[in-house]
């Protein structure tokens, strides 16, 4: 019964006139599905269906990619430095392997070209496995990377060094350790904050790189997924890839930094005590794919409650949404701007998308571990320097210190966070309340600074609605160098 249904679906999609080559991700995903169906169902497919599938994979996918490899420029889907590269090339490799017995030279050529260009994307995983495109595209990229590595190793006995690229083996460990105590992800870039994707990426990596803690992490996700019924499309591979390996949980370091285009900074309080803090922050490079003006932003949690938020992505079809230039229309949309993030603005102006954030100093061995970001180029033309320091005073308190050298004392600096909690402001103190718990923010300096709160609102009617979020902010001015210190406390 199931085989008959699957065969009907294969026949149906193979009779499409094309697989939407103008958006080649569609071709790649369809080729992946058809190749897997053809391989798994080969023995029960009618000869006419096999012939149709082989013809469709060749004419609707593989024949098209030969020319792309030959003439495509650096921004071609086959060669670019984003998720498109891995997803599209993986789809072509799976299609080539599926029909290799019919077209061996074509398959050899496509596999050779794919493994040549896939490193263009994966080089950005160095050194610590961070996918700069954010967690949503981490999942998309690594799911197809898992399919690629499994197919190459199973069929050809090697993956041509792809799995040995710096950072690839660390990628799932990074993602696992940057998942918060509430089970949510650090949803920077165009990502939502939902729990980690229930994809079998974890089982592939746990086996390939001998990481039993990854398998244990994913089994917990799987059990919750089964209970919720919220299955992802590659969920079925969790069965053949299942990994029973177990490992005791390692003690979490107070401060861990994962370096990359987006440096990810993670502070962990002792989770065995009430109100312990979890804080995760980032540097970044806003003009890279899917980035927002969010350098210096941070998410903080206590008691499994997220106190500062990220609104995620807006509609991809908005005019100018993909214009990353400093004056690009992308930055006029609220969710993409620094005004919607937990960071700074100077004179209520946008961060500079051509700027970057970098780690300046850190000490993860100190009794009070700290990390300092240099965000100066992010505010080019607005300031002389900008540094943000996070210092963990103890398990329940973190001090955020911003040092801003302004061009003149008449300028103002806005310090802000966005939250879904209820907010009570009283001078230099704000108390956030949610689910029967509370969290406090206190401005330590300047002594005359105070908090205000306002509802978060989208910039235009075309943007996604925003409901239930508050912007908590403080504005300071009057000095050529501003030092803003805010104490975050779960007490």
Model-derived regions, located:
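CBM-like, beta-strand-rich accessory domains located in the C-terminal region of large
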Residues: 218, 224, 319-491
């Amino acid at each position: 019964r199931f085989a008959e249904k699957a065969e009907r679906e294969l026949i149906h999609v193979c009779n499409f006139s094309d697989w939407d080559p103008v958006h080649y991700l569609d071709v790649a995903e369809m080729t992946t599905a058809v190749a897997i169906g053809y391989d798994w169902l080969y023995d029960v497919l009618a000869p006419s269906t096999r012939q149709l599938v082989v013809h469709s994979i060749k004419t609707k996918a593989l024949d098209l990619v030969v020319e792309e490899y030959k003439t495509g420029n650096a921004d071609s889907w086959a060669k670019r430095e984003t998720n498109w590269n891995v997803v599209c090339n993986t789809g072509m490799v799976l299609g080539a392997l599926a029909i290799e017995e019919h077209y061996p030279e074509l398959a050899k050529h496509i596999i050779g070209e794919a493994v040549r260009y896939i490193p263009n994307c994966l080089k950005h995983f160095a050194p610590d496995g961070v996918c700069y495109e954010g967690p949503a595209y981490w999942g998309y990229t690594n799911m197809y990377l898992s399919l690629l590595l499994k197919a190459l190793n199973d069929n050809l006995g090697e993956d041509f060094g792809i799995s040995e690229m710096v950072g690839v083996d660390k990628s799932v460990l990074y993602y696992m350790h940057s998942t918060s105590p509430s089970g949510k992800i650090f949803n920077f870039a165009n990502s939502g904050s939902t729990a980690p994707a229930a994809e079998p990426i974890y089982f592939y990596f746990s086996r390939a790189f001998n990481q039993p803690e990854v398998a244990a992490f994913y089994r917990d996700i799987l059990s919750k997924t089964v209970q919720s019924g919220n299955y992802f499309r590659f969920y079925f591979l969790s069965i053949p890839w299942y990994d029973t390996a177990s490992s005791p949980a390692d003690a979490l370091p107070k401060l861990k930094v994962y370096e990359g285009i987006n440096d990810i900074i993670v502070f962990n309080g002792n989770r065995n005590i009430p109100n312990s803090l979890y804080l995760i922050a980032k540097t970044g490079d806003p003009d890279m794919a899917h980035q927002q003006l969010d350098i210096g932003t941070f998410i903080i949690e206590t008691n499994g409650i997220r106190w500062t938020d990220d609104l995620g992505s807006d509609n991809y079809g908005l005019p100018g949404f993909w214009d990353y230039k400093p004056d690009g229309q992308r930055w006029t949309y609220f969710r993409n701007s620094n005004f919607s993030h937990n960071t700074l603005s100077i004179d209520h102006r946008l961060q500079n998308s051509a700027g970057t954030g970098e780690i300046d100093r850190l000490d993860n061995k100190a009794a009070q571990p700290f990390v300092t970001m240099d965000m100066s180029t992010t505010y080019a033309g607005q300031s002389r320097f900008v540094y943000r320091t996070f210092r963990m005073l103890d398990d329940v308190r973190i001090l955020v210190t911003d040092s801003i050298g302004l061009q003149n004392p008449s300028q103002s600096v806005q310090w802000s966070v966005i939250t879904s909690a209820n907010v009570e402001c009283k001078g230099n103190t704000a108390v956030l309340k949610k689910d029967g718990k509370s969290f406090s923010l206190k401005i330590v300096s300047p002594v005359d600074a105070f908090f205000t709160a306002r509802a978060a609102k989208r910039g235009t009617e075309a943007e996604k609605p925003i409901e239930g979020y508050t912007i908590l902010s403080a504005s300071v001015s009057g000095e050529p160098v501003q030092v803003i210190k805010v104490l975050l406390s779960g007490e």
